[in-house]
């Protein structure tokens, strides 16, 4: 079996930055305890489990405000997905110490929405409902931001002005966004478009589109909650024309997927730890359908290997 290691794949700079911020917080003895992450720091359970070992508690829930209601003291880390001004204000009112790990690409979109609101615009925001990134973006200006996920959402959308900006969640499929923007253009011809697919998402999607077409199967390593991982599987199937499965780690690979397969493409979401992806590749490289000794699929990567290393500051 030949393995096509799609490149680039895996961690993006926004994810690494967020994890380094959280790890440094865990090492900072001056921060009030306990330390919480408001939602998953990035959408990967292996990462959140590793942070639990670092003493950082991940709290998840339907919305950031609802999660915040569970916290009465300590330090709160805002995730890479960003939060609304209301969440920041509520944390301040509760007297919590806050650390912002928002991805710079998300902050850029928030700033754009604020600027356009000041100019009297309404904003159509393309994103996944019940995902934290759109929650934060809509929360910047909920009175003028309209969240849509698919073309059907446009049927009932009415906007009381011709001044309309269209932007999007950074981890969407660039092809889905383009198609939706074309539909929006037809209904709102005066709309201005500002595509905000982050560069890391874009190049990973394009790599799958260009490199997965030579494979019989694509395996995307990523958490089920990771939108960018799920979009990579979608791109493989819809753009490259190659069947794809998303797995959280090697233990989720089903042997029947590999029957009759000669070429397997492997990629990983932007929040997937590199050791987890390497373990998947190592399994596929040694797999022999005729040798049961090669069939074991057990995640063995220790949690200590999941998070990026940070330098420990020496006490003066």
From Swiss-Prot:
The keyword Disulfide bond does not apply. Isopentenyl diphosphate binds at residues 43, 81, 131, 226, 228, 271. Binds 1 [4Fe-4S] cluster per subunit. Gene3D superfamilies: 3.40.50.11270, 4-hydroxy-3-methylbut-2-enyl diphosphate reductase, catalytic domain. It is an enzyme of class 1 (oxidoreductase). It comes from the Bacteria. The keyword ATP-binding does not apply. It catalyses: isopentenyl diphosphate + 2 oxidized [2Fe-2S]-[ferredoxin] + H2O = (2E)-4-hydroxy-3-methylbut-2-enyl diphosphate + 2 reduced [2Fe-2S]-[ferredoxin] + 2 H(+); dimethylallyl diphosphate + 2 oxidized [2Fe-2S]-[ferredoxin] + H2O = (2E)-4-hydroxy-3-methylbut-2-enyl diphosphate + 2 reduced [2Fe-2S]-[ferredoxin] + 2 H(+). Catalyzes the conversion of 1-hydroxy-2-methyl-2-(E)-butenyl 4-diphosphate (HMBPP) into a mixture of isopentenyl diphosphate (IPP) and dimethylallyl diphosphate (DMAPP). Acts in the terminal step of the DOXP/MEP pathway for isoprenoid precursor biosynthesis. This is 4-hydroxy-3-methylbut-2-enyl diphosphate reductase.
